[in-house]
Amino acid sequence: MTRLKVAIVGGSGYAGGEFLRLALSHPMLEVTQVTSERNAGDPITFVHPNLRGRSSLKFRKMAELEPVDVLVLALPHGNAAKNFSEFEGLADTIIDLSADFRIKDLEQYKKYYGEDHPAPDLLSSFVYGNPELHRDELRGAKRIACAGCFATSVILALYPLLKLGVPYPKDIIATGLVGSSAAGASSSDASHHPERAGSFRVYQATGHRHTAEVNQELPGNFPIHLTAIASPSIRGILTTLQLWIPDGYSERDVWSAYREVYGDEPFIRIVKVRKGLHRYPDPKLLDGSNFCDIGFETDNESGRVVVMSAIDNLVKGTAGHALQCLNIAQGWEETLGLEFVGLHP
């Protein structure tokens, strides 16, 4: 059995480190190179102590990269697109974990990222990395733009309902509680422990960047408004979404939509239990896993539907999603290397 050789560019960050963790346990992958300009020469366990005993690799500089089968780019937004000529000849398959190649509309990219796209000619060569929506396009794909974490929690929650073609009478509101790891490994005033710990802080009331992905991927052109709140947790996103169904529709239709679209999905679980503590999705139960749990409650009197989605932002929201895409692209079992469940308690 020949394993594909993998290099991770930007492997000292949380996203790159999480892909590294998953890839080291994947039976079809062999991680041969991990880059970090700041930590070049240090063992990867210097930054990722959870990987002790799993690998003797050391970080290297990007200039030292050698050709591989799969190149994973885990760089700050903008870097992959601006420097893509340095990477494209290094691997047959390239997966980008940043936002650089997700958004196909150049005006939307400029609106939400504040600059013209640095490499617009490359956009059409990338498949948007959401397996539940783009499984067919991902088969055999050579370039994959992994979906954003908050966007994933919103898109997966709403897609079955918007696919129905129901004329929802009001705008859709999405509010996400986001763990601190979503901000990345670099420290800032906002991530300073005395400021972040125990705090629920709205950090993007309107104009969240992932709005562009949500609008691009969801059918129906419904107005969807995102608000992001920093939560005290380290991992996880819990998103609540509010929409109103028109007269003539009921909870039975909501159930039917989710069952029809997600009935056979390996990583989506519909959580709707009548009693007990765990009646709704909880991101704490998904730590380290590639699952997305979705639940809902319907107020028949007002027609309001509250949808809840939970993911681990570093796994289903980033690295696990990327590995799921790679499995599909290579024709492997989609769940390969991702079968594990979360932790409890």
Explain the meaning of each model-derived region.
Residues 1-196, 201-205, 297-300, 338-345:
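N-terminal Rossmann-like NAD(P) cofactor-binding subdomain of oxidoreductases
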Residues 14, 125, 149-156, 205-212, ...:
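Conserved active-site and cofactor/substrate-binding residues in soluble primary-metabolism enzymes
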Residues 18, 22, 156, 160, ...:
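Alpha-helical scaffold segments in soluble metabolic enzymes
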Residues 26, 221, 264-265:
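Acidic-histidine catalytic/liganding microenvironments
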Residues 141, 236-240, 304-306:
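Short, solvent-exposed beta-strand edge segments and adjacent coil->beta transition regions
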Residues 202-206, 229-232, 282-286:
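Short Gly/Pro-enriched turn/cap motifs at secondary-structure boundaries
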Residues 207-234, 238-240:
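Oxyanion-binding "anion nests"
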Residues 242-345:
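C-terminal active-site/capping subdomain that shapes the small-molecule cofactor and substrate pocket
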